């Protein structure tokens, strides 16, 4: 039990540097421009990193261009984007830290149980940022805001995945 209490404190500490209101606004406004492109976002991740696609039993070994148009692919893409949308909606307010922690903790635990590695998480991050930066106005300020946001999330997730 002590272990989980310490882990919770570490995770809260990792996200204890919430985005400023300006950073949150930049992340939210850029995300609003792409969040309805769920299928394209997941397609970009799988296209860049086929090993990530292979981690999904329902998509492993299948032609990406064929599955891209399936309902199963759209459903999973929507789950991923909805999770990100929820985190982003909560960002920028310290009063939401416990809610953010809860979401990150569940996602981290679920992915740890599936054997997802830090490397795979980082590949997802790279593909996600590549997609966003290619589809919105992307300046140094937007890049810095996304880096801060994703650093917070990934620090917390990695504490769970490596625990």
Curated annotation (Swiss-Prot):
What keywords appear on the UniProt entry?
Answer: Heme, Iron, Metal-binding, Oxygen transport, Signal, Transport
- The residue range of the signal peptide is 1-16
Query: One matching Pfam family, short form?
Result: Globin
The UniProt entry, under CDD domains, shows: Mb-like (cd01040)
The family line of this record is: Belongs to the globin family.
Q: Does the keyword Glycosyltransferase apply?
A: no
Every copy of the Globin domain together lies at: 18-162
Q: What is this protein called?
A: Globin CTT-Z
Q: Does the keyword Transport apply?
A: yes
Q: What else is known?
A: There are at least 12 different components in Midge globin.
The entry's heme b-binding residues are 76, 111
Q: Identify the species of origin.
A: Chironomus thummi thummi (Midge)
Identify the coding gene. CTT-Z
Gene Ontology CC entries for this record:
extracellular region; hemoglobin complex
Instruction: Give the GO molecular function terms.
Output: heme binding; metal ion binding; oxygen binding; oxygen carrier activity
InterPro entries in the cross-refs: Erythrocruorin (IPR002336), Globin (IPR000971), Globin-like_sf (IPR009050), Globin/Proto (IPR012292), Mb-like_M (IPR044399)
The beginning of the lineage is: Eukaryota, Metazoa, Ecdysozoa, Arthropoda, Hexapoda
């Amino acid at each position: 039990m002590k272990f989980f209490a310490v882990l919770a404190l570490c995770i809260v500490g990792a996200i204890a540097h919430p985005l400023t209101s300006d950073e949150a606004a930049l992340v939210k406004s850029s995300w609003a421009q792409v969040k309805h492109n769920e299928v394209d976002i997941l397609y970009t991740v799988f296209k860049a990193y086929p090993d990530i696609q292979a981690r999904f039993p329902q998509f492993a070994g299948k032609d990406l261009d064929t599955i891209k148009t399936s309902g199963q692919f759209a459903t999973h893409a929507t789950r991923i984007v909805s999770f990100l949308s929820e985190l982003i909606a909560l960002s920028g307010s310290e009063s939401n830290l416990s809610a953010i922690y809860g979401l990150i903790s569940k996602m981290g635990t679920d992915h740890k149980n599936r054997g997802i590695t830090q490397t795979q998480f980082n590949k997802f991050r790279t593909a996600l940022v590549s997609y966003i930066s290619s589809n919105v106005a992307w300046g140094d300020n937007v890049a810095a805001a996304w880096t801060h946001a994703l650093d917070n999330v990934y620090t917390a997730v990695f504490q769970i995945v490596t625990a």
